[in-house]
A protein has these predicted regions:
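Juxtamembrane helix-loop transition sites at the ends of transmembrane segments
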Residues: 19, 32, 120-126
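Amphipathic alpha-helical coiled-coil segments
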Residues: 2, 46-119, 126-137
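Short, solvent-exposed, mixed-charge loop/turn linkers that connect secondary-structure elements
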Residues: 1-45, 131-145
Length: 145
């Protein structure tokens, strides 16, 4: 009877606590939770105090900030989903290695994990894109990004 052992083929020991290697795709650092804090920290408050008129882009700034917060929440959800499906894949691989799992279940878990991982990378991309867009809107009102 043919027996496929992923641990022997890939030369990697699987466990539920396995750490994935960091990829080059990472979300940017955006620590702000509320608009006022971001507005002051980004230097826009001092510009508002000066004679420059930011009233034309203030709505764009608020909308852009809300998009960043929304995409960050989607990113958090995608990160949780990735962790859950990784655990499913590891358990299916272990079951298959022990001879109690079926090949179909293992490949189905692999397909699910691949789709969820792709969704995670999409979420990272959308989050990074929304922060860049917010920075672009901010730079319209100021001379510096």
């Amino acid at each position: 009877v043919a027996f496929l052992s992923l641990t022997r083929i890939l030369k990697v020991h699987y466990s539920v606590d396995i750490k994935l290697r960091d990829s080059e795709i990472k979300p940017v650092d955006f620590k702000f939770k509320d608009y006022k804090t971001w507005f002051v920290d980004s230097g826009l408050a001092t510009i508002m105090d000066s004679k420059l008129d930011l009233s034309g882009i203030e709505l764009e700034l608020k909308t852009g900030f809300l998009k960043v917060l929304e995409s960050r929440e989607k990113l958090k959800l995608a990160k949780k989903n990735r962790k859950i499906t990784r655990a499913l894949l590891v358990s299916e691989a272990a079951n298959y290695d022990f001879g109690i799992g079926e090949a179909g279940d293992l490949f189905e878990a692999l397909i699910i994990y691949t789709r969820v991982l792709s969704g995670y990378y999409d979420s990272v991309y959308n989050f990074n894109l929304s922060t860049v867009e917010l920075n672009r809107i901010k730079s319209k009102g100021t001379a510096n990004p």
